Each structure stands twice: as C-alpha cells, then as structure tokens.
C-alpha cells in the first residue's frame, strides 16, 4: 500500500476527532502525484475533496491490500506497517493541538524524496516520501 498522511510538528494527526488542518493545493498535488490511480479514503476524508471521481470511499481503509493509494487522517485507521511499501508524509510545519498521533517510526524507512512547496493556507508544506524496500508491491 502507498500511504499518505498529514502531520503537525509533533507527528499529531487529529484533535478531538477532527483533522488539524487542510489545504487545497496539497489536495491538488496529492491527486497529481497518484496520476490515473484511485485514492482510497474514509467518508470523513472524502468531504474535503471537490472532485470525487478519483476517490474510492471506504469505512475500513486499513483493510486494503496491494499497490493502492490511501490517504488516512485518523491514525486509528492505519494499516499494519508490514502492508505499507511507501509513505508520503505532508508536514504542516506548525504546532497544532493533537490527541491522535502518527505511530510509525520513520527512522526505519528510507527517505527518498524531500520537497517543500507553498500551500493555499500554509506558507510552507513539506512533502517527504519514504520507502520500505522489503515490501515493494
């Protein structure tokens, strides 16, 4: 699986069962990155996308298998780490209140790409791509 997540400075993903932030340029970049592939999301996550023709909405995205793209906002829905071959981390470069955190230790993964870009509502968003070469689908 190709996992996409957004985190704040302390790896927080949610607060009080809500996403911490969102950004329209980040969403556009995400859809461009996956090309013609579908993006698997929860019903909650789907609400932030205007163009939903590339989305597949699932209640249980962590059950996915194979070389699929999945954007997960709630860390309680993260798949087992041994099913993930790529992680794309978008960093807000801000501190937000958090009570749910990204739990995968990225130090055990290979950082293969690092880019910064200006978002619509964020001056700087960092995109990091990590690979687990032992699990390439």
Residue map of PLM features:
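Enzymes that bind and transform nitrogen-containing heteroaromatic metabolites
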Residues: 1-137
């Amino acid at each position: 699986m190709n996992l996409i997540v957004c985190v704040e400075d302390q790896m927080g993903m949610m607060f009080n069962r809500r996403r911490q932030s969102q950004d329209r340029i980040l969403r556009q970049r995400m859809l461009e990155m996956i090309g013609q592939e579908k993006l698997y999301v929860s019903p909650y996550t789907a609400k932030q996308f205007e163009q939903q023709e590339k989305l597949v909405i699932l209640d249980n995205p962590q059950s996915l298998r194979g070389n699929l793209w999945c954007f997960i906002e709630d860390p309680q829905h993260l798949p087992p780490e041994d099913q993930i071959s790529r992680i794309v981390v978008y960093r807000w470069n801000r501190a937000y209140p958090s009570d749910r955190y990204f739990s995968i230790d990225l130090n055990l993964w290979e950082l293969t790409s690092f880019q910064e870009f200006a978002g619509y509502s964020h001056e700087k968003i960092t995109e990091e791509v990590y690979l687990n070469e032992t699990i390439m689908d």
